[in-house]
């Protein structure tokens, strides 16, 4: 507990710990974060690579319960994503929308779709060409965190920006 | 005679002559009243069917399990039986059954015909009136042994309660296996008691929300197989599949209309909201029923096809709304404290089942079609997705606990909850109509 208390004084460290925690839970099938890509942390990625995007920019944003509003922290992440995507235009982009398990299956498919659309619209507002962007909703069918409490649900309420098409 | 599976065509029924000549009174021994306090299950003795080696005992066992699970019957332990039935066609010694408080007695026999078919017959006796209440015989091929038992259980249920049974039915569902963050989901079908599981998809893509066609031959469901999640139709016997409509965005939450001619579903708009459409399966024409900047989903027709109940968050959080089948007169009907979703209209037309989230719990409940008379039948940490038995007396849903979802049934009193045995995790059950 002492260690966590120490970490909380350093916001940068919190962000890193949070990211690693998420990476540890992620599905091995969809490499969209540092651990899945076999990286141990920031700095190892080639600028402009998918790894660079995931590790240094941050590929996901989180939402409040039953909400698709882009929070202030998410706006910062998405703005960073937009800047990077506008620099590396070779990528096509799929924004995945996800929900936590605290909703019914069909409603959560709709909620995930709305979250993906909200993230997409934000990226478009920051200059990313809408022709590069697609969305898909996974509802609550692809959780990255699997515990039965708030700490997991908050990680599962997410929109993940994934890169496809030409890449390095 | 229409049938669900080709081999079932050979099931044929005929009434057996009454062993007693007294005209049969048309009363029911069991009263179905969901508003009554404790329903006392009717003590019933179900003897092993004579003949057929182990088959006779097996049929008796299936009939016993069906009736017991309904919560309306209390089958008496065989070790308490005094009379050993040797001739199931002869009147039993009623006093021997009355003394162990068997209000009803089932006798029967099973035999092989020369053509290889099974002949099964049963008689239902009212022990206190001292007369036969019902008797029928059935012919079926080997593959339908269990169905014969379910049909007999339905006949007994109907004779004793005055309501149609629901045992000769199937359930389509999603079989789930593997870790929670890498769950394999397969379409599957089984008998309502969990027997005869058959898989209808290979698990390579996510499949969700299968729903039965009223003709029992098809299901509509949602699959990610093309990359984009879409609604499909599947012919259960042939395995033939087709996409329902060719829409630009995700289609989901499908259900058939009661005449089987339409599929109603949600279609994702480009702005991220979802609206409800109906598609005519013959003409392929689509009709938009809602047009709101909200989530409109989980549509379900009333059994006469004139109305649709659905979920919408147009008022802020998800609630239940009813509209005409043409989209007219959209009216909110749920006003309780909580979030309401997955409304499903009862096949009897009188009630709407739903999932409600309140106070950190998920509840399965029913309300009248105007939203009044809400009753919660089951509460839990995580449970959802009710489906109606064809007689409108029992619901099945799925409950997530101990690492994954399992199927559970509950009757309208809320007092009789039963697990449905499945070898893997299971979700999204949809109950078939009675088979034919």
Swiss-Prot record, chain A:
Q: Whom does it interact with, and what assembly results? A: The Tol-Pal system is composed of five core proteins: the inner membrane proteins TolA, TolQ and TolR, the periplasmic protein TolB and the outer membrane protein Pal. They form a network linking the inner and outer membranes and the peptidoglycan layer.
Residues with lipid group (S-diacylglycerol cysteine): 25
Q: Which GO terms describe its cellular component?
A: cell outer membrane
Q: Which Gene3D superfamilies match?
A: OmpA-like domain (3.30.1330.60)
CDD domains, per database record:
OmpA_C-like
The protein here is known as Peptidoglycan-associated lipoprotein
Where the record annotates domain OmpA-like, the positions are 50-167
InterPro entries per the UniProt record, alphabetical: Bact_OuterMem_StrucFunc (IPR050330), OMP_bac (IPR006664), OmpA-like (IPR006665), OMPA-like_CS (IPR006690), OmpA-like_sf (IPR036737), Pal (IPR039001), Pal_lipo_C (IPR014169)
Entry keyword set: Cell cycle, Cell division, Cell outer membrane, Lipoprotein, Membrane, Palmitate, Signal
* Alphabetical GO biological process terms: cell division
Chief subcellular location equals membrane
**Similarity comment text for this entry:** Belongs to the Pal lipoprotein family.
Q: What does this protein do?
A: Part of the Tol-Pal system, which plays a role in outer membrane invagination during cell division and is important for maintaining outer membrane integrity.
Localization, UniProt: Cell outer membrane
Lipid modification (N-palmitoyl cysteine), residues: 25
NCBIfam families per the UniProt record, alphabetical: Pal_lipo (TIGR02802)
Q: What is the superkingdom listed in this entry's lineage?
A: Bacteria
Q: How is the protein disposed in the membrane?
A: Lipid-anchor
Q: Where is the signal peptide?
A: 1-24
